[in-house]
Amino acid sequence: MREKIRLNSSAGTGHFYTTDKNKRTMPEKMEIKKYDPVVRKHVVYKEGKIK
């Protein structure tokens, strides 16, 4: 089953992306480099829960 997740910026800007992932095939926490428009550069985004 695909679950919705939130990708939080590690730059501390409060910016986030929402996406989904398959928990069965990828049980570990997701970390991916994406663009943060607040600091205008690519930073690591880490998985967090949607509240």
Swiss-Prot record:
GO BP of this protein: translation
InterPro entries: Ribosomal_bL33 (IPR001705), Ribosomal_bL33_CS (IPR018264), Ribosomal_bL33_sf (IPR038584), Ribosomal_zn-bd (IPR011332)
GO molecular function: structural constituent of ribosome
One of the record's GO cellular component terms: cytosolic large ribosomal subunit
Chain positions covered by the region annotation Disordered: 1-24
Gene3D superfamilies: Ribosomal protein L33
Keywords of the record: Ribonucleoprotein, Ribosomal protein
Keyword Repressor set for record: no
Superkingdom of the organism of origin: Bacteria
Coiled-coil residue spans: none
Keyword Transferase among UniProt keywords: no
Pfam family, one: Ribosomal_L33
Family: Belongs to the bacterial ribosomal protein bL33 family.
Protein name (record): Large ribosomal subunit protein bL33
Organism: Cellvibrio japonicus (strain Ueda107)
